Amino acid sequence: MDFRTTCEETKTGVCLLQDGNQEPFKVRLHLARDLLMLQEQDVLCVSGEPFYSGERTVTIRRQTVGGFGLSIKGGAEHNIPVVISKISKEQRAELSGLLFIGDAILQINGINVRKCRHEEVVQVLRNAGEEVTLTVSFLKRAPAFLKLPVNEDCACAPSDQSSGTSSPLCDSGLHLNYHPNNTDTLSCSSWPTSPGLRWEKRWCDLRLIPLLHARFSQYVPGTDLSRQNESQVVAVDGVCSGILQCLSAEDCMDWLQAIASNISNLTKHNIKKINRNFPVNQQIVYMGWCEAREQESLQDRVYTPVFLALRGSCLYRFLSPPVTTWDWTRAEKTFSVCEIMCKVLKDSDLLDRRKHCFTMQSECGEDLYFSVELESDLAQWERAFQTATFLEVERIQCKTYACVLESHLMGLTIDFSTGFICFDAATKAVLWRYKFSQLKGSSDDGKSKIKFLFQNPDTKQIEAKELEFSNLFAVLHCIHSFFAAKVACLDPLFLGNQAATTAAVSSASTSKAKHLA
């Protein structure tokens, strides 16, 4: 793909578009800050206000050297009309100003050749006389196999040599000599050109894809099969770009990264606007698309697009992005960020051919598997989840869970400042208390019981404490969240990034970070 980058937010290039069952054809992509434009070439009359005209009639004379000054490809054998594939410099076809590469020849001297084979059209043009009148119409979606140049400035030099053979996929130069004695010459009728009209080939909008909350993918929908050098972009309203085919994997990745960057910038800007309407404890940290892997799917579609959002204390899973306040109450699923475990997967842990995956284990032990498109998307998600967890732990400071110790109802408080506190649920009397730094290990039975191994600060001996919970995974994940927040407080880089993120999503000042007790 040939492209030029005008600035960080814009990019222009030419690629192929596979739209439904049609043959791929050339389109121009133009990436703006908030829009991806797909454009196709067309020929417009630009005398006065530009307008489309389906057909043009052009009369040109044959030259001794160079003939008509054009070459053709295609034909009925490929289910398309014959198309002008080259126009020679400073020859009759170019000087007329009315013929363009990509024009389909519909009539020759009034004879309908729309459904003629390539060689038949060549013969008609050979025998057309010194002057020929062509009725043409620009073939906007010329199949890519014709390999037509995008621009008119092809290096096609005039020649007076003739060819005895022609091929529908090779340029047949129509500079052939006129044969006046040929009895098969077809009769002519007068088709005058339109005086005073000027025509130009231009790129015209074919499809507009708004980028706010748009998604893109290199994979065949619902599968882990990656298309080679291909991708598609889908707008939030479901409008799809079609399959965009690049010349190389590098070009494809350049486009995906540029599109992803613009989508990300739009999302961040939108989050800032939405957060003005939410209190400090309900600020949005992240919004974006990913694909969820369906567990034990019996259908061909293993992956389904889902929209994830981190807001306040919750992770929301939507089928489509929330637009109104009411939409936030209709999430497909909602999880407490402190009670879920997120893990970015290494290549050796992936379940299939999709890269850039992460898992989440819910508070009830359900394992969820997600895929994103780019490595940068995965890094962005990981940072956002860490930030959301940190902010929530800082906000709540402590979390208490009911538990059972030797058939007695107890409570376990996980406190960000002091550590672990176990107390009698009835009397509130504290049974034991340990700091986070005293926890040297733990184990669980995967059902309800957790065994904590604490180090006594005086004797240095390990003391085992076993508690039974009705919500085992929620407790385990909450403990992990508090430990992660403690570790984050010791990381200057994280604290710097977290401060910037907090300032972006909230006007409230960040509470002072507490260090490991």
Curated annotation (Swiss-Prot):
Keywords, in A-Z order: Actin-binding, Cytoplasm, Cytoskeleton, Nucleus
Give GO terms: molecular function aspect only. Answer: actin binding; structural molecule activity
Among InterPro entries, the record links this protein to: PDZ, PDZ_sf, PH-like_dom_sf, PH_domain, Syntrophin, Syntrophin_4th
Instruction: Say if the entry is tagged with keyword Nuclease.
Output: no
Q: Taking every annotated instance into account, which residue ranges of this chain make up the domain PH?
A: 283-390
Its primary localisation, in coarse terms, equals cytoplasm
Q: What is known of its domains?
A: The PDZ domain binds to the last three or four amino acids of DGKZ. The association with dystrophin or related proteins probably leaves the PDZ domain available to recruit proteins to the membrane.
* Subunit text: Interacts with the dystrophin protein DMD and related proteins DTNA and DTNB. Interacts with DGKZ.
PANTHER family to which the protein is assigned, alphabetical: GAMMA-1-SYNTROPHIN, SYNTROPHIN
The name of this protein is Gamma-1-syntrophin
Identify the species of origin: Mus musculus
